[in-house]
Amino acid sequence: MSFEKIDICDIKDSFTRLIRDDWALLIAGKADDYNTMTVSWGMTGELWGKDVVAVFVRPQRYTYEFMEKYGDFTLSFFSGEYKKALSFCGAKSGRDYDKAKECSLNAVELGGSVAFEEANLIIACKKIAFADMDPSKFLVPEIEKNYHNGD
């Protein structure tokens, strides 16, 4: 499958709606060493003169190790027919399952990163910064309900 390269500003759909409602698979690593997980939190914007994507990966997640090890990652967005696969990838650990195989997803190399051939939108990202979440800095009490067990 071939993908058409577009500027992130030319994505027709709202990123907020895409990540909140459709979710995405975050894939970190290289073709022979990667993991994926479902993400439904994230944002796009402008920072330091660059178009950026921010994603949030808990340290307990297997994918976190890949995010630390590699400088690139992708976000793969899918049509609704893949919602069950995204649910699986969010509930199961790559330590225990080959998620791509379990969900019949085909990994493809994309500029040194990995994405899934079945995606209808892929955002290729380069890690430029990272920060740990500090719950003591939460200002709105409702956030705690989404920060399960402090992770």
Could you tell me what each predicted segment is?
Residues 1-151:
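Basic, polyanion-binding surface patches
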